[in-house]
Amino acid sequence: MKTTRSESLFAEAQSLFPGGVNSPVRAFRAVGGTPRFIARGEGALIFDVDGNRYIDYVLSWGPLIAGHTHPDVVAAIAEQAARGTSFGAPTELESELARLIIQAMPAVEMVRFVSSGTEAAMSALRLARAATRRDKVIKFAGCYHGHFDGFLVQAGSGVATLGLPDSPGVTAATAAGTLTAPYNDLDAVEALLKANPGEVAAIAVEPVAGNMGLVLPQPGFLAGLRRLADEHGALLIFDEVMTGFRVAYGGAQGRYGITPDLTCLGKVIGGGLPAAAYGGRRELMELIAPAGPVYQAGTLSGNPLAMAAGIATLRIIGAPGVFERLEQATAALCAGFERAAADADIPLRAAYAGSMWGFFFTGDPVVDYASAKKADTRRYARFFHAMLERGVYLAPAQFEAAFVSLAHSDALIQETIAAAADALRSL
């Protein structure tokens, strides 16, 4: 596979950007080799600057549930761009997208748009602290809520990939306000609440963990968090930046039937453009300025291009049968990977929720960050490159989720499974 153009561009990029990239995982540090520079996308496919074609399971890290360059999304962006790209003033598009979100998620009675998942999580925590008049937050080891200082403790995603326990620059005082528990461990959460009586403002969780690889919530875990939050006067924050409109149209809260106090959204709601949001009960959201005293603002919040792309995307995936088709494709993919691994006598466990999926090279159950870290990351790196050579683009790190789009046809799913079988035999 020819990669000379990507190699040349990456060499130049390293003189322009820290590590040659604008988000760490893109640098291929966890798997080695040269990042592919992408020239264009079409449906479920991406093409790099050297002309190589790949079936894409990264999908811009989740937003592109309709696939690359879906004609409805492209048309919506083009039509809005012709009218204006940004106004810094209210638009009807903001209200239209907000209504779609509120209709899909009963826990969200009001919403505030921001431009990134980090902003959404940061703002939701500030609101929770103001509402409860408490300072501490419980998060879960390996869960990632953006690069805000208060959540950058035992974080997942690129932090996990780079093996950083925490980030330099986060003050000890800030870190002290962030309590961590193992994912899926209700006893640990209860112990933290009892050890910090009246001090915990919120429990923040990825309802399906997607930043330590994909780890599913154990039966009763999310319901247990709801119960513990209620018993101890804390708010429950679902970070659905990844799971919202991805594991079900109504997100993880709809899939599992749990009602959080606050919800963070991103990725899918922007249709591939920078958009995120946080929302919740009316009495909480009315504490946000200018209705209330909790300040939050943003120059590009509710940007009309992103709103247009988000509306088009939610209309596409809101059609009958969409999530059934997505889940069937994802289930087939996971079953195919496990079958291919078994045939190659290689331990592999795959899991999925909706159109979000992942796998670990291990024979043991993966229920939290500690068990995820026991998986064979060196084998993952070899498998990643073997798949890349066979035209399949997976996440360049073990500790990331993968995604399926509406553009992933049965033929592409079977092509991927065949590539995986061949790649596994080569390891």
Curated annotation (Swiss-Prot):
EC numbers, comma separated: 5.4.3.8
Name of the protein described by the UniProt record: Glutamate-1-semialdehyde 2,1-aminomutase
NCBIfam families assigned: hemL (TIGR00713), PRK00062.1 (NF000818)
Localization of this protein: Cytoplasm
UniProt source species: Roseiflexus sp. (strain RS-1)
GO molecular function: glutamate-1-semialdehyde 2,1-aminomutase activity; pyridoxal phosphate binding; transaminase activity
Gene3D superfamilies (UniProt xref): Aspartate Aminotransferase, domain 1, Type I PLP-dependent aspartate aminotransferase-like (Major domain)
Isomerase found in the keyword field: yes
Family classification: Belongs to the class-III pyridoxal-phosphate-dependent aminotransferase family. HemL subfamily.
Quaternary context: Homodimer.
GO cellular component: cytoplasm
